[in-house]
Amino acid sequence: MIKGISALELLHRETASTNRIKTLCGTLDKMLCGGIIIGKGIIELCGVPGSGKTLLCKILALNIQIPKSIGGPGLNAIYIDSEGGFSDNRLREISKSTLNYINAKKKTEDMTCENLIKNIKYIRIFDLEELINVLTLLPSMCKNNNIGIIIIDSISMLIRICNLNNQPYRLKMQQKIAKTLENMSKEYSLSIIVTNHMTKKYFDDQKKKDQFANVATGKKNLEPSLGLSWNSLICERLILKREKDLKADSEALNTISVTNSFGEVAFFKINLNGIQDY
């Protein structure tokens, strides 16, 4: 049976501060209209290795725990790791920023770095079959653990290595996974975050060249992996990219740009405790 909600209820959901996960980076939260929205479908973080995808995932897993009494969702997180890049030490460093924000608003003895980390359920998987098995368990896990966000880091790693010579099967599986995640997002009011890699594409004809600004014929261009069919399965894409710091006399790529589906761009810098405004 198809269930619907009124347009007014949808508006209230999207504008409520407790229905957004703040990044605590002013420029990024402004671009995101207050933060990452909860319950709207799949949101993809896309970029090359080292562009800050996993860092931003950890920040969201921590910041979703900001209490409702100070405008946060007050929920917990599930973090599904397919690449083994999850670092407990880095998570502890980042948790200090979340805790400082909470204590500045309303100091509470119940909220500590240890509790913030404890409220993130970590699941390590190695292939698509394991992910599908986990997906069948997620509804009960969400109900019993006050879950508000599910993070899969990364989705592309699992799909790309699945039956490499059987593209129809891969397409079928990614559609099945995306539909399951989208339904869960709306039924249980969850934020679904997945990370995706960039892949090299080559264009040899004028028509394709014109579709991508500043791409010369025959030269490589970076695009989100998983193809065009995947694009229709997500509700938002944020592309992360390392940039040179124009404010500093350095060639280091220590600034991150984030571009949304509308072409809007926000910048932040990575620091010891997470991210900060550029």
Where are these regions (language model features)?
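Conserved P-loop NTPase nucleotide-binding/switch module
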Residues: I150-K179, D204-F212
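Hydrophobic/aromatic beta-strand patches that form the interior of the parallel beta-sheet core
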Residues: I43-L45, I78-I80, K121-I123, I193, ...
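The Walker A/P-loop phosphate-binding site
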Residues: M1-K105
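Phosphate-binding/switch region of NTP-binding enzymes
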Residues: K172, K179, N183-Y278
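Conserved catalytic network of the ASCE P-loop NTPase/AAA+ motor domain
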Residues: G35-I38, K68-P73, T112-N115, S140-N145, ...
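Conserved inter-motif catalytic segment of the P-loop NTP-binding fold
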Residues: G72-Q167
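Amphipathic alpha-helical transducer elements in NTP-driven molecular machines
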Residues: K22-C25, D29, G39, T54, ...
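Solvent-exposed alpha-helical segments within well-ordered globular domains of core cellular machineries
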Residues: G26, K30, L62, N89-E93, ...
